[in-house]
Amino acid sequence: MIRIEGIQKQYGRGSAAVRVLRDVSLRVETGELVSIMGSSGSGKSTLLNILGILDDYDQGAYYLDDKLIRNLSEREAAHYRNRLIGFVFQSFNLLGFKSAEENVALPLYYQGVSRRARNKLAREYLERVGLGHRAEHLPAELSGGERQRVAVARALITKPKLLLADEPTGALDTATSYQLMDLLREINQQGMTVVVVTHEHDIAEMTSRTIRLKDGRVEAADPERAAQEPGA
């Protein structure tokens, strides 16, 4: 699903240049649930932006679903994002003046789906994340955990092959965080590839494999846990 080979990324030039990613190579197979861990400044946010086709890289190669992602136009990048990737963010990124159902339906609006069809699908996806009864509520009327579930439903409605979750539990309490991770694991068990960026060790432990970044390099890919997995 994801293959990264020798990725390098820096910001700025000359003496002001900051190297953020240094020869990063990794793979994520179809159907995996993987976490990427690292402290502030480790490069994990930059790596996520590259995975999500929100930023380019300077050297190396990134293959997503066997397609080389490199020097794409804005239109091409948007095409692959919309077709292949669903996003979940720490801050939810919901529109406050639209209901939960309308927020979930929004990606389909941009795909030209009719109002009736997209609202029907949005209700189905809210049911899937346990929030069908909250479909008409505004984000301000929902708890943090409910808002994040709405965000997950919105990410899933376009039927992406890859779900990228950037610190999805960062704004949630412990119990709600674990409930959200249970939902992501359930989604993964249904066949979707899920990558979770986190700085929380307990959240990373709920994934099948952890890739650790330090100073822009892959420090480890959790070999001990990998060895415990079936077939390892």
Indicate residue ranges for each PLM-predicted region:
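ABC-family P-loop ATPase nucleotide-binding domain
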Residues: 1-10, 220-232
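ABC family nucleotide-binding domain
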Residues: 2-213
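H-loop (His-switch) and adjacent beta-strand-loop-beta switch element
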Residues: 210-223
